[in-house]
Regions:
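Short, surface-exposed "cap/lid" segments of acyl-processing enzymes
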Residues: 1-63
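Structural beta-sheet core signal
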Residues: 6, 49, 118, 160, ...
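Conserved beta-strand elements of beta-rich interaction domains across eukaryotes
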Residues: 9-12, 54-56, 123, 164-166, ...
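Short, flexible/disordered intra-domain loops and linkers
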Residues: 15-27, 59-74, 169-171, 199-208
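Alpha/beta-hydrolase active-site loop
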Residues: 30, 60-110, 133-141, 148
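Structural alpha-beta junctions
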Residues: 32-48, 154-155, 181-190, 214-226
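Serine-dependent carboxylesterase/thioesterase catalytic core
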Residues: 97-187, 198-201
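C-terminal catalytic histidine-bearing segment of alpha/beta-hydrolase fold enzymes
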Residues: 190-252
């Protein structure tokens, strides 16, 4: 069973909630439409979109995965039980699907045999970054948590799509010890960025941190796949969202 878990960005919400003035122009990127886009790029995967625990105006807060300040700025910590929450959320979703699965030809989903792909877009990348902290935490725990360690080993790949948030640091994880723990897991790493984030002259730390993140992992022997999209185009929010479609060429 191949499963993709998606964490979206600010503005992204259900079509119904995006009909108001602040989001209407971006309804193309509603969660329903994003699910269709991801299904085209990952046709063999069951796609789950995980909504933020709350949305204030157009700002997303993933409080159940990572502590956040004003504007959804993350405050990373060794553990916020994000992995446990993700595991329980997936279990609950799979159980519900199996309950309503009346088609005898469809195989019931089994989480213990799942191959997981985690995708973060824009603000949603803060969840992936918190998971990196938790990988480190569980690897160094004196009393190993076998259940969580087994869950971690279901994760085959992680995709960072143009990560960004309103804070002035920690857009990308650059602590070497945390990335060393991550590298030991041999998870496939995919980074797709656009000038909207990594070439923002008002937020130069984003590009600097992204470069450090990629370089540290490469130096640790991880064959990271990194792509800059729309390099010849003017920085725009539209092309920031377009990265969701652009990854299609890299998933076939």
């Amino acid at each position: 069973m191949d499963v993709l878990l998606y964490f979206g960005g600010d503005i992204q919400d259900t079509q119904e909630n995006m009909k108001h003035a602040g989001s209407k122009a971006y309804i193309e990127w509603s969660l329903e439409n994003t699910a269709k886009i991801l299904t085209i790029s990952f046709p063999k995967k069951h796609v789950f979109l995980i909504r933020p625990s709350r949305v204030l105006e157009t700002l997303s807060y993933f409080d159940n995965f990572v502590p956040s300040k004003e504007y959804g700025i993350p405050v990373f910590c060794p553990t916020h039980n994000a992995l446990k929450h993700l595991q329980e959320l997936l279990k609950s979703s799979v159980n519900r699907i199996n309950m309503y699965n009346t088609d005898k030809e469809l195989t019931h989903l089994n989480i213990e045999k799942a191959k997981l792909t985690l995708v973060g877009f824009s603000k949603g990348c803060i969840v992936l970054n918190q998971l990196l902290h938790e990988f480190h935490y569980y690897q160094n725990k004196l009393d190993p948590d076998i259940e969580i360690n087994n869950f971690i080993h279901l994760i085959e790949s992680m995709w960072w799509l143009d990560g960004g948030h309103a804070g002035s640091k920690d857009t990308w994880i650059v602590e070497k010890s945390i990335l060393e723990s991550f590298a030991k897991l041999r998870i496939d790493v995919n980074v797709h960025v656009t000038p909207y984030q990594v070439q923002d002259s008002h937020r130069p730390w984003i590009g600097e941190e992204e470069s450090h993140f990629c370089n540290i992992l490469r130096n640790l022997g991880i064959p990271i796949k990194r792509t800059l999209h729309f390099a010849d185009k003017t920085r725009s929010l539209q092309n920031h969202f377009n990265v969701l479609k652009a990854i299609w060429n890299y998933t076939q």
